[in-house]
């Protein structure tokens, strides 16, 4: 029997707000560059509104690319099947074989709060990447909210996830691990 269950990873209100603010900040240089280019190309005769410099053009290209890549690497959801737990992302999905999972449980309260981000993002489309926290050590987060999280422990790595219906997620995964 090939069971497969999908759990969404939806952004909470705080993440939605911070993502919106950062998106405006990242995309503003691209919009300004387009505006100045348009004004320069189609401005009134005899009026020279100026040209965007190479730095602004580079920034205008890099910042939207950063926004796209950050979104593409954010967790969209989690798939549990008979063989693997898959962290669904547009770029570089993460596969954790069920045979490597030693424990699944509700995450410690506030595990993400106060953590040191070693590599990844905190508050722009998610909380994902490599983190460290005193009393926890290094862990990998692939979450879209700060509460109702789940810890997945393998022999080498601790994962922190944010599936919808965390209790059901833990039960479904736990049942497969006991087989």
Feature names for model-found ranges:
Residues 42-43, 58-62, 75-78, 125-126, ...:
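Short amphipathic alpha-helical segments, especially helix-boundary/capping motifs
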Residues 48-56, 119:
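Glycine-rich, flexible loop segments associated with nucleotide phosphate handling
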């Amino acid at each position: 029997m090939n069971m497969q269950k999908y759990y969404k990873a939806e952004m909470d209100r705080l993440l939605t707000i911070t993502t919106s603010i950062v998106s405006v900040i990242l995309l503003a240089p691209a919009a300004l560059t387009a505006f100045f280019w348009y004004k320069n190309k189609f401005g009134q005769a005899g009026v020279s509104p100026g040209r965007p410099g190479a730095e602004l053009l580079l920034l205008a290209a890099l910042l939207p690319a950063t926004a796209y890549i950050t979104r593409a690497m954010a967790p969209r959801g989690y798939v549990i099947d008979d063989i693997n737990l898959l962290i669904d992302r547009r770029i570089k999905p993460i596969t954790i074989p069920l045979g490597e999972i030693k424990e699944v449980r509700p995450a410690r309260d506030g595990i993400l709060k106060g953590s040191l981000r070693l590599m990844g993002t905190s508050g722009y489309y998610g909380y994902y990447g490599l983190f460290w926290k005193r009393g926890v050590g290094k862990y990998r987060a692939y979450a879209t909210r700060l509460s109702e999280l789940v810890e997945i422990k393998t022999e080498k790595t601790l994962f922190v996830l944010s599936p919808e219906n965390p209790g059901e997620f833990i039960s479904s995964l736990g049942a497969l691990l006991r087989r």
